[in-house]
């Protein structure tokens, strides 16, 4: 069976309902926490390390929920939402590979913010470079990622870690 290499907003919403990778497996969060509108490219090869990559996008408009509350009179997308989007995409990659379990962010190395997403922006682009996947008793994805707004890189994160768990009872 040929794997799908791009996903629409409707595909991602199906993933948030547990319909894409099957019950009990990797899911994306539902809106409003779903921070991706589409995955334009996903592959098990390529990227900075030759071990896989994802490119995804979020359309920006001034009516997005976070602009009204972060900050009043000084609207900016919270940087933590961009970081969470990168974790979301690493988890999606693990599910797309066919791995079982529910995704949980497990941390990251260095994170840098050197720009911002304002309501006047048009598009956020996420680039994820898979460094390593481990498929033992724990399924783990490790990746580096960047967030760009209208073509300008504004955040970076090293060693984003996401695990898939068949049981979260002891987590």
Curated annotation (Swiss-Prot):
Pathway connected to this protein: Lipid metabolism; fatty acid biosynthesis
Residues at the active site: 70
KW Metal-binding (keyword) present: no
InterPro entries for this protein: FabA, FabA_FabZ, HotDog_dom_sf
GO BP term (any one): unsaturated fatty acid biosynthetic process
Keywords: Cytoplasm, Fatty acid biosynthesis, Fatty acid metabolism, Isomerase, Lipid biosynthesis, Lipid metabolism, Lyase
Highest taxon above the source species: Bacteria
Subunit structure and binding partners: Homodimer.
Designated name of the protein: 3-hydroxydecanoyl-[acyl-carrier-protein] dehydratase
Lineage: Bacteria, Pseudomonadati, Pseudomonadota, Gammaproteobacteria, Pseudomonadales
């Amino acid at each position: 069976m040929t794997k799908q290499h791009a996903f629409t907003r409707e595909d991602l919403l199906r993933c948030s309902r547990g319909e894409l990778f099957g019950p009990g497996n990797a899911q994306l969060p539902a809106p409003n926490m779903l921070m991706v509108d589409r995955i334009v490219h996903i592959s098990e090869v390529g990227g900075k390390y030759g071990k896989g990559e994802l490119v995804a996008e979020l359309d920006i408009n001034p009516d997005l929920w976070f602009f009204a509350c972060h900050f009043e009179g000084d609207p900016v997308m919270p940087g933590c939402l961009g970081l969470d989007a990168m974790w979301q995409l690493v988890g999606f990659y693990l599910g797309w590979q066919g791995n079982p379990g529910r995704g949980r962010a497990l941390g990251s190395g260095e994170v840098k913010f050197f720009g911002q997403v304002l309501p006047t922006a048009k598009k956020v682009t996420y680039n994820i470079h898979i460094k390593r996947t481990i498929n033992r008793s724990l399924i783990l994805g490790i990746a580096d990622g960047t967030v760009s707004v209208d073509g300008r890189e504004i955040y970076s994160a090293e060693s984003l870690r996401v695990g898939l768990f068949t049981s979260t009872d002891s987590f």
